Amino acid sequence: MRATCRVLLNLLILASVLCPHPVWAQTTTKDGLARYLDGQTEHLSQVAMEIWDLAELGYQETQSAELLAEELEAHGFSVERGVAGIPTAFVASYGSGHPIVGILGEYDALPGINQDRVPERRPIEGKDRGHACGHNLFGTASAAAAIAASEWLKATGSEGTIRFYGTPAEEGGSGKVYMVRAGLFDDTDVVLTWHPSDRNDASPGSNLAVKSAMFRFRGVSAHAAAAPDRGRSALDGVEAMDYMTNLLREHVPQETRIHYVITAGGEAPNVIPDYAEVYYYVRHPDPETTREIFDRVVAAAEGAASGTGTTVEVEVMGGSYSRLPVESLQRLVYENLKAVGGVAYDQEEQRFADLIKETLGTGLPLGSQEEIQPFEWEQGYASSDNGDVSWMTPMGTLVTATWVPGTAAHTWQAVAADGMSIGVKGMIVAAKAMAFTAVDLFSDPEKLTEIGQEFRDRRGTDFRYDPLLGDRDPPLDYRLRGGG
């Protein structure tokens, strides 16, 4: 009998060594969550690299979205696919009750740029798209943070819901706006998000609202030399519109940005073109001012059509609000980012970074990837569809050094880093910072109340959401027809 008991005791001791504690028993603290995520790094890297290889464009991210959805399902999340009328959008939830903390995840790639995982310019033959904005890392880190937060909820028995939003087509497709319009954020208490970058930063700030549209002019074709009087040039309509819009630049607020590209203008000089089109972006820090300036650009198009004997059709392609900052939430994100720390390179990564740095201009120096940038107001001049989310619920943001310092977004240098271990290290920093922040939000109802009050004060009591893109359906084929 004693021998039998001794054998059983030895077996129990061996089991405790091989399987010391279930995952939930290790994730009651932030340190435990950090160790949990460190232990998942190899697997998370595989997920991110698979999405990097797929490089699926906006609204076409079928495999990338499914990969993340299945990952979340495997960890006990319930997943609703095809939300907001978008096949590649989904919402994954774990837990019950409030607070509801959302985490945004993106996974669309960019067209027209690709690069191998090497520190010199080397496009991949036969590939015409790539993750030049790091969304392969974005979606993966956000899913990892959501899973880590779910492990904390399980381990502590706390009430609350962690929700992952799978958000497609950020790059010009305004995917999140349709999700906002569908009411998917109406009950969310706080949302967290991040973005790949060349630095670690969680400063408060905002960016620009944007409204974009395609202007399609139609005229009458004729021989440009033999019968010019019979023609009505659609290209003249475009050029007249562009001229008037360029005059308009003197009479708009200082912070306004207007850009355009002629996407069709005829095929031969001796044929008066009966079709031409021009693609416009209008930006300003204030969403309503953006709307007003856009209407003036439309008036220029209508005047151009009238003056050139052509017609014009306007298709709104996208639109998003500027980001509404909540400083108390940003301070919380910042403190957690500081607690996690920056990105440290090993020797191989340092050699990679040295070679990449030789191809870059001015910018942050090597070594800054290990630091956290100071907490200070930042005005950005790009736009993102997460702006609309930030007007529905408080949104905390951060960026991490997934790229070599000095790297800009939408470059081959970004694609290269997004596909190797430097990107993965920055991704893990982001996952930890968001998981830590989610834990704080679940744990501290007073902080949540403070954040909510600041959000309501900044938004104002008379706010009514009116999406800049109007009531149009999601342009699921916008990448297939060259939009964005």
Task: Describe each region flagged by the PLM.
Residues M1-C5:
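N-terminal secretory signal peptides that target proteins for export/translocation
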